[in-house]
């Protein structure tokens, strides 16, 4: 697989979601958690979604329980939390693993394409962000300390390239 849109992921209801449906759009993929110090970033992600979705931005939330068990809920609990607490309307998909032998293939591809600090592949923590351009290639990887609004200029640049 050579670009993000070659992959298929799972929706919260277990159905398959081909990323090809967003071919030609800019994608921001984020591993999320409901009980994390970075959880308030849902608010910034939703703000980006509302501002840029009509211009070609897709935000995909990937719940993950690999970091200190901070996403223990089932799909219904996660959806309810996101909706009621942060009024999230961007797609929040099925819970996945982002590291190790059980890692979702999309995350294996993204971490190979864009390494972290000191060249590491592993996702460091919840709310690591991967910005993917209209060509399906990873543009930027950001750690959890980078707030969603800090990506605005990169998003605007990526949206302009198409």
Model-predicted segments: where are they?
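Chalcogenol-based redox active-site neighborhoods
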Residues: 1-162
